[in-house]
């Protein structure tokens, strides 16, 4: 990656803490970027923290923007997430499958629950873990209080969601859906090698090759 001689610049304060800024020297002058915007120019997207609607909207927007910039060049999605909302995660998943560029996924830290589903949803042959990361799959969580008939409706819905998520994991791993249902019945933690053997990822990366 050529950052054209960036230097450490001012630091932006956000609600999430400190975000480093980089100064880029070009023939047209000097420009400053927050580090995530600069990496977006290299087609790198970060999915970090709880999966919820606002974060999902940002990730979807970045995926669509990078497709419009170059529909034939890979997008790199770095994941460090404990999971979160199923509907928010599915909006990211569907967009990953919808757009033309391959989306390469990389687990840094952890990819749990919906984070694990998005990790395995990357393009075949382009799903990675770093050596000390971890992956966790399980069934969706839910709870509801109210009239018995409403509880019955919500029970049917969460069972339907459970089956859909198992279908997705089965599709991307090649595992029979019956096996996936058993393996997601409780929290199922995996190290990178176990995740690779299961088919959730394709490779464990120790060093950047290029």
Swiss-Prot record:
GO terms for molecular function: ATP-dependent peptidase activity; ATPase binding; serine-type endopeptidase activity. PROSITE patterns: CLP_PROTEASE_HIS, CLP_PROTEASE_SER. Its main location: cytoplasm. It is an enzyme of class 3 (hydrolase). One of its GO terms (biological process) is protein quality control for misfolded or incompletely synthesized proteins. Belongs to the peptidase S14 family. PANTHER family: ATP-DEPENDENT CLP PROTEASE PROTEOLYTIC SUBUNIT. Fourteen ClpP subunits assemble into 2 heptameric rings which stack back to back to give a disk-like structure with a central cavity, resembling the structure of eukaryotic proteasomes. This is ATP-dependent Clp protease proteolytic subunit. It comes from Marinomonas sp. (strain MWYL1). The gene is clpP.
């Amino acid at each position: 990656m050529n950052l054209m001689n960036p230097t450490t610049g001012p630091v932006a304060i956000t609600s999430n803490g400190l975000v480093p800024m980089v100064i880029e020297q070009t023939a047209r002058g000097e420009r400053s970027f927050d580090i995530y915007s600069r990496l977006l120019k290299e087609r790198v997207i970060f999915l970090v923290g709880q999966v919820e609607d606002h974060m999902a909207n940002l990730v979807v927007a970045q995926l669509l923007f990078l497709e419009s910039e170059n529909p034939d060049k890979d997008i790199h999605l770095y994941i460090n997430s404990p999971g979160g909302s199923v509907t928010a995660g599915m909006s990211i998943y569907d967009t990953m499958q919808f757009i033309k560029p391959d989306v390469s996924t990389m687990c840094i830290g952890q990819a749990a629950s919906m984070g694990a589903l998005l990790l395995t949803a990357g393009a075949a042959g382009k799903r990675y873990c770093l050596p000390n990361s971890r992956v966790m799959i399980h069934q969706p969580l839910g709870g509801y209080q109210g009239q018995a008939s409403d509880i019955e409706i919500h029970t049917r819905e969460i069972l339907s969601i459970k089956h859909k998520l198992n279908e997705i994991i089965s599709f991307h791993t090649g595992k029979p859906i019956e096996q996936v249902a058993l393996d997601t019945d409780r929290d199922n933690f995996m190290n990178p090698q176990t995740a690779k053997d299961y088919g959730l990822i394709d490779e464990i990366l120790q060093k950047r090759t290029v």
